[in-house]
A protein has these predicted regions:
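Conserved ABC ATPase "signature" region
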Residues: 78-79, 126-144
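Conserved ABC ATPase signature
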Residues: 149-153, 157
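Catalytic Walker B motif of ABC-type/P-loop ATPase nucleotide-binding domains
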Residues: 174-177
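A short, proline-enriched helix->beta-strand linker immediately N-terminal to the Walker B motif
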Residues: 168-172
Length: 286
């Protein structure tokens, strides 16, 4: 019997992730309204959006924590809605997720946290797991920290430990949810640099959800802006910076919504009125 070898060029050119008219609802309320875009192999895509834009729901749907109401998610050329449970398990093993709050278990050491996916999803010997844990911690700059507790780590070190755990299964796709949240600018810059180094070293496809523009400009190959559950714009950092779309400009230039601006004006007016009243009271007492 003659078999045909897979077309490696076609596989390389195929998007790593494709979303087609993806919709997600919570009860009667639709959160994502027909999201469609591709994520190419080896690229870093940053998903931007304000609070309540739907970007976190999109990320949770991509990693399987939310089920779409309709539409399609394709990963590595496979439609997640039609594959077998065994194929789904294989795909999940190719995904790594670093959560916003690090999500480390306080009752475990750092090494035990990193080892958890290996112990849950593989039959590797403990000696092999220990070697892999040390290797991953070294790759994120935490060599020698395997016996520390999460409570003994700084915020930036917790983020790095979470990245090590996300990487321990050697994923092809790595997801980050607000990797710079809660970090001071210097530590946040270190996490950005780590993401760049991981991409360079392991050629992974990386998807980052953030609202930190400085971080997005540094790490992104492309950006997609989500607003009210819709894709507003998508392009390279250069294309996004030069966009004239009003919603893109509003987000990138950090212009408040009209309703928010009116609230701020009202608060400013109240503050000024109170300041005038206090000054008048001081003059009367004098």
């Amino acid at each position: 019997m003659v078999t045909t070898a897979p077309n490696l060029d076609a596989l390389d050119s195929q998007p790593m992730i494709s979303l087609r008219n993806l919709r997600v609802s919570y009860g009667a309320r639709e959160i994502l309204h027909g999201i469609t875009f591709d994520v190419q192999r080896g690229e870093t895509l940053v998903i931007l959006g304000g609070s309540g834009s739907g970007k976190s729901t999109l990320l949770r749907t991509l990693v399987g924590l939310e089920k779409p109401t309709s539409g399609e998610i394709w990963i590595k050329g496979k439609n997640l809605a039609t594959i077998s449970p065994e194929e789904m398990d294989d795909i999940r093993k190719k995904l790594g997720m670093s959560f916003q709050g690090s999500a480390l278990f306080g009752s475990m050491t750092v090494g035990e946290n990193v080892a958890l996916p290996l112990r849950e999803h593989t039959k590797l010997e403990e000696s092999t797991i220990e070697i892999m844990v040390r290797l991953k911690l070294e790759q994120v700059g935490l060599e020698g920290f395997e016996y520390y507790r999460p409570s003994e780590l700084s915020g930036g070190m917790k983020k790095r430990a979470a990245v090590a755990r996300a990487m321990v299964m050697d994923p092809e796709i790595l997801f980050f949810d607000e990797p710079s949240a809660g970090l001071d600018p210097i530590i946040a810059a270190g996490i950005d640099q780590l993401i760049l180094e991981l991409k360079q070293a392991f050629k992974m496809t990386i998807i980052v959800v953030t609202h930190e523009l400085a971080s997005a400009y540094l790490i992104a190959d492309r950006m997609v802006l989500i607003d009210k559950g819709n894709v507003v714009a998508m392009g390279s950092t250069t294309e996004m910076r030069s966009s004239t779309q009003p919603r893109v400009r509003q987000f990138l230039d950090r212009v408040a919504e009209p309703e928010v601006a009116r609230e701020l004006d009202y608060l400013q007016m109240l503050t000024e009125d109170r300041r005038v009243d206090r000054n008048a009271a001081k003059r009367e007492r004098a």
